[in-house]
């Protein structure tokens, strides 16, 4: 009965990916943002558990759903038809503009000034230089104890790619839910 809320962010699952796509603020910048009412901003998905009294508890880390990388198209539905809501998160971006190597070496001020002063820009070459790293989707199966288990590979959704949307419904009218996931450049 009570609706829960799941929101996605872009916290990578691996520490390596976190270090290669995230630019961390130094202490002074962090404090300036807090003082400027930007509050404390941290990358992570949020799973808001409805407490039934007009309040919610954030349980994403407890539930094992906090980190799903570049996330789009999250759905909450009974994926495995066991009566418990599961979570699907579609992932991937074809050209990863958050890659810090790209930002530091290709999209830096020196190259921007060169493009402006010389007036030359090879857009195709520039796009080809941006990293393209396919990642798998996440299919979190409800474990019935406020936690979820990623079963994407077991359910045929673990192939790395660039998915950015999904929908579900009983498309063939057989009484169970069907899933459609769209992929880019596959």
Predicted segment positions?
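Acidic, glycine/proline-rich Ca2+-coordinating loop motifs
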Residues: 1-186
